[in-house]
Amino acid sequence: FEVSELALYTIDMEIRDLLRRQKIEIIPVLGSITDGGLLTRVMAQHKVQVVLHAAAYKHVPLVEKNPIVGMSNNVLGTHTLALAAATAGVERFILISSDKAVRPQNIMGASKRMAELVVQDLASRSAGKTVFTMVRFGNVMGSSGSVIPLFQDQIAKGGPVTLTHREVTRFFMTIPEAATLVLVAVSFACGWDGIVLDESPPIP
């Protein structure tokens, strides 16, 4: 399920290539998490058991410049998706959140914290039919929007390298660690709780 046609096409081709010898049906759906009717129909039609909610605007400067759209997608979209999951009887709903939701310092972080509260509220009223939980990611090395590709590009162009502060410290997780965190949440979540990776030592 993806709102970007190019992103959906790309990931569909990648997954089909990886699973070309497996008899697994892949159904790409083009749509927005703000479309509650479509979400409910798709989940019910395909008997979806697990929802991994990673559809968020996460680039801090862009969300700062587009706060209404950022809040609409990250907060209202989360509410629409979580409600559709509960309505369709999905077994598990995993919200992919951010460490920026802790004492948020920007609009993106605030939107992720509000998304957590929205899902927590639905969890308290779901009567156990749908298990809601969340995982908080830090900086994922190599992911879209990660600072590492940005730094590499800036260095390749001869600098300067932009830092938020001279004394800044960043914690990183690898893509396999991030994937494992999500799988742990799917496997062991039994109610509203949060799962956070004990990340590697900070990189000063």
Predicted stretch roles:
Residues 11-12:
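Conserved SAM-binding loop
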Residues 83-86, 107, 113-195, 200:
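NAD(P)-dependent short-chain dehydrogenase/reductase
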Residues 22, 27-50:
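Conserved Rossmann-fold cofactor-binding substructure of NAD(P)-dependent oxidoreductases
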